From Swiss-Prot:
Reactions catalysed, as given in the entry: 5,6,7,8-tetrahydromethanopterin + A = 7,8-dihydromethanopterin + AH2
Pathway: Cofactor biosynthesis; 5,6,7,8-tetrahydromethanopterin biosynthesis
Keyword tags: 4Fe-4S, Electron transport, Iron, Iron-sulfur, Metal-binding, Oxidoreductase, Repeat, Transport
GO biological process: 5,6,7,8-tetrahydromethanopterin biosynthetic process
Pfam annotation, one family: Fer4
Name this protein carries in UniProt: Dihydromethanopterin reductase (acceptor)
Transmembrane segments: none
Subunit architecture: Homodimer.
Cofactor note (record): Binds 2 [4Fe-4S] clusters.
Domain 4Fe-4S ferredoxin-type: 144-175, 176-205
Length: 239
């Protein structure tokens, strides 16, 4: 396939998020002329910050025409920019990672968010859509954002991670460190490096895929104009 102008839809999943970013980074390295227009759901705006990827998106979408970053919080309820899919502006739309919520909406034709609107308009505009669901079958190993392991935490009155967090994302309660506010966290990792007891962690957790999510993936597989891929890396095989 020959794709030169593509759109990337990101939804609010931590699983597959960094791998998706690495795939698009690789595509840009292979072909600097490739234009990538990024559509970010409201939940993805938060999750990108948690995983330290928010500022890195400019390496994929630098800001020129068809290389903008469209955030749902800035696009309003009507998502006017998705009209580009009807105007022959894109060769393909890739949605990765796609949460179970997004997949269920696609399965039943609901288009009430920036990314699901993009999918709907892409299909109507005969633009090929490729979806990478995070919940396909069985169980998955998902990467979690930074959190405090309370078994390891010593509840120090003087807490280097809390005192040095540049985003003031670590709260205290009754004079000791309490928890990380993930809506403030930028995923920089400074806190993890500063904790002398290795109490701040982020890493793999096994998560069960629900039956309903697997059924919705099967429905999406049968839909006109949409192809389901099992991993972000499968996108590389299309170029």
């Amino acid at each position: 396939m020959s794709f030169q102008r593509i759109a990337w839809g990101i939804t609010g999943a931590g699983h597959f998020l960094d791998r998706s970013y690495q795939v698009f980074k690789e595509l840009k390295l292979r072909n600097p002329e490739l234009s990538v227009n990024t559509y970010v759901s409201r939940a993805a705006e938060e999750v990108l910050r948690m995983y330290g990827l928010e500022q890195k998106l400019v390496k994929i979408s630098g800001g020129d025409y068809l290389e903008e970053i469209f955030r749902e919080s800035e696009q309003g309820s009507s998502s006017p920019k998705v009209g580009r899919f009807a105007l022959d502006r894109y060769d393909a739309l890739f949605v990765t990672p796609a949460t179970s919520n997004t997949v269920s909406k696609i399965a039943y034709g609901i288009a009430d968010s920036l990314v699901t609107n993009a999918v709907s308009q892409a299909v109507k505009g005969r633009v090929p859509v490729f979806v990478v669901p995070v919940d396909i079958e069985g169980s998955i190993i998902s990467e979690m954002p930074y959190n405090i392991d309370r078994k390891q935490c010593k509840h120090c009155e003087t807490c280097p991670p809390r005192e040095n967090c540049p985003h003031e994302a670590i709260s205290e309660k009754n004079g000791v460190t309490d928890q990380i506010d993930l809506l403030k966290c930028k995923g920089c990792g400074i806190c993890k490096e500063l904790c002398p007891y290795n109490a701040i962690k982020g890493g793999p957790v096994e998560v069960l895929v629900r039956d309903v999510d697997m059924r919705n993936v099967e429905i999406v597989k049968s839909l006109q104009g949409i192809t389901v891929l099992e991993s972000p890396e499968a996108i590389l095989e299309l170029f």
